Structures are given as structure tokens and as C-alpha cells.
Amino acid sequence: MEEIQRYLQLKRSQQHDFLYPLIFQEYIYAFAHDRDFGRSILSENLGSKSKSSLLVVKRLISRMYQQNRFILSLNDSNQNPFWTCNNNFDSQIISEGFALIGEIPFSLRFKSCLEEKNKVNSQSLRSIHSIFPFLEDNFSHLNYILDILITHPVHVEILVQNLRYWLKDASSLHLLRFLLNDYWNSLITPKKASSSFSKKNQRLFLFLYNSHVCEYEYFFVFIRKQSSHLLSTSYGVFLERIYCYEKVERLXNVFIKVKDLQANLWLVKEPCMHYVRYQRKFILASKGTSVLMNKWKCYLVTFWQWHFSLWFHPRRIYINQLSNHSLEFLGYLSSVRMNPSVVRSQILENSFLINNGIKKLETLVPIFLLITSLAKAKFCNVLGHPISKPVWADLSDSNIIDRFGRISRNLSHYYSGSSKKKSLYRVKYILRLSCARTLARKHKSTVRAFLKRLGSELLEEFLMSEEDILSLTFPKPSSTLRGVYRSRIWYLDIIWINDLANYKSKI
């Protein structure tokens, strides 16, 4: 317990009311444009219609004060004069400004966390595909996984309470409540709500959702040392919380009623737990038994239900045995398979055949889900037969070929780590023939005649394989290069993939 408390020690700087003074001071824009914070985090444009700077926010707040827009009429409590003029624009600017300011302390704490741990090159931890080499090294020795889906916040007050653990500023929290209550109807309806809220207030939505996710994640500080190969970038930023000692004591009391304290501590300190998160999914893997994983499931459900004051459905946590189930993660179907290996041993005149099984992580392309995505994007029908793309028929030939080729290369690049590439070749075939049908539709010709006329030019655009890419790096092709091509190639320069990992969305 002392070790846990040492991890959760509070920082005095978190107890100051810094957010509210910043939002009304003159020098706020100096913080936002500080080069040390990183342009991509604090001063990234969100589009021509949604550009926001802290200077604009400052002037907008001053204008609202001059017009007394914060003062509500006592005679007509149903009206809200705050949004009488330029409702959508004012709401968007204020919400994005709030998120822009809120990112400042998180960026400062993340920067200090990297300096404390001497992690100069943080880019090496940002690659999405760095997860899979980690899984290859560790998952082959594990037995069970907990596949956890993070729930959406069911009430705006939960989002506000998430910020209260590191921010003690009542005025800023009231402003946040005011912004969120305006979108309450959209937040409680999963599809319409989230789309409306995220499109109009994208920066605020991402900021609040990330803070909500990290509230789920901070519990895994207890097994942080076991997952040191892939530390989440949010660890150093979101771990410390106000009132953490009360939460730890409550945890102990809850589990003392179920089991004795020694069993509790053993559960927390289980040495072979591995943790990975991406978007709304947690993966907690162990080489223990199903009984141990059920204990972890009970532990997590009880903790999150108390912490978020909501019903956390146990069915959101699945216990799967790696040898019998495939894991849908980052756009791949991953599983651990036993590869048989027969070794012949001979001693004098006697010979023996020894059967050995070697566990190996298999990563497969989810071909049916990819075809569904291609069908939604109108590249093929639901059976996987290629069709033309009429909306692109007005473009130039080179533009059409470039668009199809770029999609094909992106898919080939991302799924190059697949154990079996036969499914990937089928996707390339669909895109190539869809491109040919689109060009034939544009020129009012048949596909066969058009392919015969265009010939190798269209073929080269789609058949540039990993072997050709590697040949640009290695001066001479060799048998070793062909062996590398047949094996998995993890491109460690992929930082964001959009819909490639979310294959249920459109490509």
C-alpha cells in the first residue's frame, strides 16, 4: 500500500487556481504560441471556418462583458441572453478557447515528465505499429486477455468531475458546465449527439474525452513497471489526482469484504500483467489462470463503478483465451497459434521423433470487414465485386489513378505486418478493377479495352509492393530481401491511421 501511495503523491502545483485567471489575462496568447509546447498540440488550425486564437477568445469575452451577456434576466429565466447573437460562432470560439487553455498545464506536465525520465526521443513511442512488435515479444508467453471497452460518459457532470481531480477552480468548472449543458441533448444520444458536438466543438470534445479515457487508465499505474516497454504518453500527464488517498482506502475496504488484504495485494502486484490501450479499447493480458482474470474483472468493475458513480456492465469486459479466440485490435485479427515442430533425435542406433509446439502471434487482415468498408465507400458491392466510382468520373485520369493508388498503397503499408497477405492481394485487386471501371465509365469504353490500351501504367501504380520499396533502401536485390518480403514488415513511421484501424468506418 505504501508503494501505491508513493505513486499517487500529489503535486502542490495542481492545487492552484490557474485556469480561471489565465482565461481573462492579457498574456494568455503568449502561452499558446510558445514553441516549447509544440505547435501541433496548442496552435493547430482546425479549418478555415473554425480557426481560434486566444486573442480572439480574449476579445470575445471582453465584448460579452461589455454587453452584459453573462447576466441572466430574473424576470425571464427561460431565456439565455448569452447566446442571443452569433450563437454557434460564440459557443464554438469559447469552447475551443477553453480546451486550448486546458491543454497548457497538461503539456507542461507531460514535458516535465519526459525530462524527469530522460526520455529525449519521445517520437519512438508514438508509432502505432510499435505495439505489434511488443505483442509478438510478450503475448506468445501469455494465456488470457481482458478485452475492455470504455464506456461513454452518461452525464456531463462526469466530464466535469474528471477535471475536478486536477483543477480546483470553481469558475472555470461552471463555465465548462455551461458549455456542456448547451449540448446535453446531443451528448445523451450516441450517434446524432456525438457527431453534432464533435463537429462544432472538436477541440473541446477531444480534450474532455481524452481526460475521461485517462480516468479509466490511471488505475494501471499499479502495473506501470510491467508495461514499461510501451508507456502511454498520457501516463505522466494524467496520473496524479486529488483525493486519491480516499479512493485507495475505499478500494481496500471494498475488497476486504470479499477477500483478505493479502489476497488483495497479491492481485495488484501480479508480476506478469501487460497493458495496451488504443482509442476505446484496453487490453490486459496475463499468463495466469482464468480464476485470476475473473478476479481482475471483478476488481475493475467494482473500482470503476464506485469511481464514476455509474453502472459498469460486466459484459464490457471479455475474458478470452489467446489460443482459442482472435483479438480485434488496431484493424487486425490477432491470435496466438501453436506451430508444430518435429525434431528427429538419434542416439546410437535408436532414433526418436520429438514433437515441439512453438507459440506464435498471428496477425491477419480482416478481409470481410475490409470488404464491408470498401462497399460502404462504393468501391465494390457487398459480395466484393468491384464497381465504378461515379463521383470521381469527372476528375482527370491521372487524378483518378492517383486516388485509387494512394488508397491501395496506404492499405498495403498498414497491413504489411500481416502473417498472410492473400487477403491483402484481394483488396488490391478490388481497388485496381474499380479504378479501371471508373476510367472506362468516364471514357465510355469497356474495361477490357481500356486495360488493353492503358496496360502497364495502371498495373505499376497498384503493384508496387514492399519488395520494390525495400529495393530502394537496399542497393542489390537478394534472396535475403525476398525472405524479408515474405515475412512481416512493421512500418514504424505510422503515427495516425484514421479509418484504417476502424475498419467499420468508411475508408
Curated annotation (Swiss-Prot):
It is found in: Plastid, Chloroplast. The keyword Chloroplast applies. The keyword DNA repair does not apply. Keywords: Chloroplast, mRNA processing, Plastid, RNA-binding, tRNA processing. Pfam families: Intron_maturas2, MatK_N. Its main location: plastid. GO terms for molecular function: RNA binding. InterPro entries: Domain_X, Maturase_MatK, Maturase_MatK_N. One of its GO terms (cellular component) is chloroplast. GO terms for biological process: mRNA processing; RNA splicing; tRNA processing. Belongs to the intron maturase 2 family. MatK subfamily. Usually encoded in the trnK tRNA gene intron. Probably assists in splicing its own and other chloroplast group II introns. PANTHER family: MATURASE K. This is Maturase K. It comes from Craterostigma plantagineum (Blue gem).
